[in-house]
Swiss-Prot record:
Belongs to the PLPL family. Gene3D superfamilies: Cytosolic phospholipase A2 catalytic domain. Its main location: membrane. GO terms for molecular function: triacylglycerol lipase activity. This is Patatin-like phospholipase domain-containing protein PGUG_03164. It is a single-pass membrane protein. Keywords: Hydrolase, Lipid degradation, Lipid metabolism, Membrane, Transmembrane, Transmembrane helix. A motif (GXSXG) lies at residues 329-333. GO terms for biological process: lipid catabolic process; triglyceride metabolic process. The chain crosses the membrane at residues 123-143. Probable lipid hydrolase. Residues 680-717 are annotated as: Disordered.
Length: 717
């Protein structure tokens, strides 16, 4: 059912046609391995007018004016040829190519594929391994079916089933908590929280640390408190971030952990407000513990139209003030991440509604349009059409740096070069600050056969024009090699805690939590929980062992295929990593899809369908919120203290001529931008400098350029 209420900014046109045309022209360029000249022109698949653009017009748009005649004969714009050239396009005759003075591009061949033994045995090996993997998949399916049927028919019956259905029908987080506590009480799981002993964390250390922190805080021993906090503000201190602490109840963890979290937050806030600690000591302290504790990131996987479930994940986090400031997305997840990082909180609350489906029109072309296009170009969708449609989600031609300045959130989108052996790039405000988000979004969605590789575009803010990024190289779907870029996030932003929303259908089918997952304990009988026996394995020990055995065996043979390079390079892409990546994080959400959903995997959702996807994402996020809330409560307390200590240090050290705040210093005082050296490399603030300036305003702006090893942090006061 379609609503008549208009969507927020529904009628706004964020499209810059000049940028779209420049992007479309860039797609027509090709290079040559030998002389650098342009290769034969491509067939008209991006529009008849664009296909007819001559090389001189393109060169004037995409490259600077040459200085001499030798430069005029060789354009500086370089892109790949083998991935972009249509797989079904007719080849021009050699005579015509020679007439234009162009050489045919030489095909590249992997040197390790040249041996006689490889040529002779490759296909027999691949066929045998594939048949064996299929047999293992059948056995794996039998084990999973046994576990599911045993739980459905023997465990989830009677009142327990009624309470679970009630829990699944919860529409708000508050309602979900109420229903989860009711189910915990019925299953006697609430008693588990009051028993401190548990083998997955050091409860004695947690209790002693809590008592010590409380004693130091109450006695006003601020220096000692600060030193003691440095020892416990680290990732997974004493095991308190072990997932098993949140996997034995539908809502809740050990009471000891609750008390510890509250005391740590209170102690950090006490240090922040303490007048017994110098601002410089505070700054050093918060700089150290921030680096030690790390940051949290939200990672949204690809998954075609299943990725729209991420809207519900973002909405649940936003409604509970838990949306991390670092968000990464790949393919369809990149679309959701782009929307979240280019809009403010208030704007997002108006956009994350079923009416957003009106702007999701990527798959609107009927079959009689996209089938001929696929036959001509090798891709179902048109790149320039997607560029126009994605502008609403990226707020026009916004760059990564501009999005960060607008919302304070750091957007990351993973893309893969068209060359199968080139390294992956994680585009963000550090690696590609001037790169236009929608071009990166298209590249991350360029699955072979769905969308051809595209050129990333970057903005020249002074001229308000765009030019090709990275010498015009072409890029495609990042999920082929790095769906969840955890290592890159740690490098750029010191991320060591990740919330992963995984909707890839080929991955979620193999998810199995034998010991339960966060907010979803193993379904044990009430007889066992009544006797305070809370630990059990799904389906029993034998079923769990067989499930793990078959899954590891499948992974082993997939690894063998990758190592021996047995798979053919379809569309010049390496497909061997799509099952062999790391797809999980500290918290992993696996929204379940029905078989009928696969029919609509490349279809635009209706308002009713998108509303159901949003509700599904919320339901699957609710069980994880408590775990994330505990983590972010400490992280946010550290950031509050760090922000305040920076402001205090800058004010006291660089304003010695007067006391008080800038508004009392006269109408012509203005505190200008402060540039800090790297917070973690400098041992003191001796390198920190203040650039004073005088104008008629009294507004003070403080900017820190070094939030982490290579990140930016802006604070406005």
């Amino acid at each position: 059912m379609t609503s008549s209420t208009p969507l927020y900014d529904e009628n706004e046109d964020y499209i810059d046609e000049n940028h779209i045309n420049t992007f479309a022209k860039a797609l027509l360029w090709e290079d040559d391995d030998h002389d650098g000249l342009a290769s034969p022109p491509l067939p008209a698949y991006e529009g008849d007018k664009l296909a007819e653009v001559n090389a001189e017009e393109l060169s004037s748009v995409l490259t600077p004016e040459p200085n001499n005649e030798s430069e005029k004969s060789r354009p500086e714009f370089v892109v790949s040829h083998n991935d972009w050239y249509p797989i079904n396009a007719p080849e021009k005759s050699k005579a015509k190519a020679d007439a234009k003075g162009r050489k045919k591009r030489a095909s590249t061949r992997d040197e390790f594929r040249s041996s006689a033994a490889y040529t002779l045995l490759r296909w027999p090996f691949l066929i045998i391994i594939t048949v064996w993997i299929l047999l293992l998949c059948i056995l794996y399916t039998v084990v999973r079916a046994y576990v599911a049927l045993s739980e459905y028919m023997l465990t989830w019956v009677g009142e327990r089933k009624v309470l679970r259905n009630k829990l699944r029908a919860s529409k708000t987080y508050e309602e979900w908590i109420e229903n989860a506590l009711e189910l915990d009480r019925y299953l006697h799981l609430d008693k588990w929280s009051s028993i401190p002993r548990f083998s997955y964390y050091d409860y004695r250390t947690v209790k002693r640390t809590t008592s010590k922190l409380r004693m130091l805080r109450m006695r006003g021993m601020d220096e000692e408190l600060m030193v003691f906090l440095q020892g416990c503000l680290k990732k997974n201190f004493a095991g308190i971030e072990n997932r098993q602490l949140y996997a034995h109840r539908y809502y809740g963890t050990k009471n000891v952990v609750h008390v510890y979290i509250d005391e740590v937050v209170a102690s950090i806030d006490h240090v922040t407000e303490s007048e017994n600690i110098t601002p410089e000591d505070k700054r050093r302290f918060f700089r150290s513990v921030s680096r030690n504790y790390g940051r949290t990131a939200l990672c949204l996987s690809g998954g075609a139209c299943f990725a729209y479930t991420h809207f519900g994940i973002v909405k649940a986090l936003l409604d509970n003030d838990l949306l991390p400031s670092i968000i990464t997305g790949t393919s369809g997840g990149g679309l959701v991440a782009a929307l979240a990082c280019t809009r403010t909180d208030d704007e997002l609350k108006q956009l994350l509604v079923p009416r957003l489906a009106r702007k999701i029109t990527a798959c609107e072309d009927p079959w009689y349009v996209w089938i001929p296009r696929w036959w001509r170009t090798g891709a179902r969708f048109d790149s320039t059409a997607w560029a126009r449609k994605s502008n609403y989600f990226t707020l026009g031609s916004l760059t990564f740096q501009e999005a960060y300045h607008r919302t304070g959130r750091r957007l990351n989108i993973s893309t893969v070069p068209a060359d199968p052996h080139s390294p992956v790039i994680l585009c963000n405000n550090i690696t590609a600050p001037n790169c236009i988000i929608w071009s990166c979004l298209l590249a991350s969605s360029a699955v072979p056969g769905i969308l051809n590789p595209v050129v990333l575009m970057m903005k020249d803010s002074k001229k308000n024009t765009i030019v090709p990024f990275s010498l015009g190289s072409k890029w495609k779907d990042g999920s082929l090699r790095t769906d969840i870029p955890i290592d890159a996030l740690k490098t750029y932003y010191n991320v060591n805690f990740t919330v992963v929303s995984q909707v890839n259908p080929h991955i979620s089918l193999f998810f199995f939590a034998p010991k339960g997952s966060v907010g979803r304990p193993v379904a044990s009988s009430r007889r066992k929980t009544r006797r305070e026996k809370y630990a059990s394995l799904r389906g029993g020990f034998i079923a769990t062992a067989l499930e793990h055995l078959f899954k590891l065996e499948i992974k082993k043979w997939l690894e063998m295929i990758k190592t021996l390079d047995l798979l053919p390079r379809l569309s010049e892409s390496d497909w061997s990593s799509i099952w062999l990546q790391r797809f999980t994080g500290s918290i992993t959400i696996w929204p379940r899809n029905n078989f009928r959903d696969f029919w609509y995997i490349l279809s635009d959702p209706s308002e009713e369908g998108l509303g159901e996807m949003i509700r599904k994402g919320e339901r699957y996020m609710f069980p994880k919120i408590l775990f994330l809330k505990h983590r972010l409560s400490i992280e946010n307390a550290i950031e509050r203290g760090r922000t305040k200590s920076k402001l205090s240090t800058a004010h006291l050290e660089h304003s010695p001529r007067f006391s008080g705040t800038p508004e009392f210093a006269g109408p012509e005082f203005q505190l200008q931008t402060v540039h800090y050296d790297d917070d973690y490399d400098s041992e003191s603030s001796a390198e920190e400098t203040l650039s004073p300036g005088f104008s008629q305003g009294t507004h003070a702006v403080l900017t820190d350029e070094s939030d982490d090893d290579s990140s930016d942090d802006e604070i406005d006061d």
